[in-house]
Amino acid sequence: METTVKFEKNSFKNRLQSMLRVDFRRMFKTKYFYIIVACALVIPILITVMMSMMDGSVSVNPQTGVETIMEGPENTWQSIGTLPTANGEAMGGMDVMGMCNINMMFMAVAVFVCLFITDDFRSGYAKNLFTVRAKKGEYVISKTVMGFVCGAMLLVAYFVGTILGGAISGLSFDLCGLTTGNLVMCMLAKILLMLVFVPIFVLISVAAKQKAWLALCGSLGGGMLLFMMVPMITPLGSTIMNVGLCCIGGLLFTIGLGAISNRVLKKTSLV
């Protein structure tokens, strides 16, 4: 009696699924992932509560004697974006709440992606991975997907923290003429916009290899070049058009920069 042994074909799909499982398992076992998510949850609570407590306080410049009155947030959603007011002015434009808001998470995800990828090269994991089974293109795809999921979780955590901070401070949840649909579209647009930023961070990280400081400096510097476009593309009054633009832009950046990252890995040393 003959026994036939069939070997499962190690296709692109199987290799990618295997790498994604390993990367997500490693991500959820990494301490700094939970630290970054915890920071994303706590930061909006601290900022909202502290700014609310300082509302109306007066500080005097000792040199000029000029008094400055601190203005706290008037609305919970100022941590998400700029709200329209009755007189047509923006609520939360260039003040503290306008600068220290949910858009900071686009820079926070850079920290995680850089540390995760540079650790692969520093520990020798990436070199062993490419030697045994994985292809460099699959590595780039896996790291991009992982970074996107991490970025989405950071945005959701910040959103939850914003609601908690507003509730603790007793701020208004009024959308000032906007709708819940606009708020949902705003969050979806921001999540999809992560597909623009994450490939940039992946590219810089694979180029920096084991040099975490270089990856962080390059990613934060490169991200800042596009950072100012975030509130314009994903305003609080976002519509399906904003979501579509972020989706198309994200796909173009993911494909284009992913191909460049793959090329960089093929043409450079792994150490």
Segments predicted by a language model, with ranges:
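Aromatic- and glycine-rich beta-strand/loop motifs that create alpha-glucan
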Residues: E2-L41
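Junction motif at the cytosolic side of a transmembrane helix
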Residues: E2-F7, D23-M27, L251-V271
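Aromatic-anchored segments of alpha-helical transmembrane domains
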Residues: V42-T48, L220-P231
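Transmembrane helix boundary and interhelical loop/hinge segments in multi-pass membrane proteins
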Residues: V113-V132
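Membrane-interfacial helix-loop-helix junctions in multi-pass membrane proteins
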Residues: P235-C246, K267-V271
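Short coil/turn motifs that cap or connect alpha-helices
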Residues: R15, K135-K136
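Secretory targeting signals
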Residues: F7-K9, F33, V37-F116, I141-A208, ...
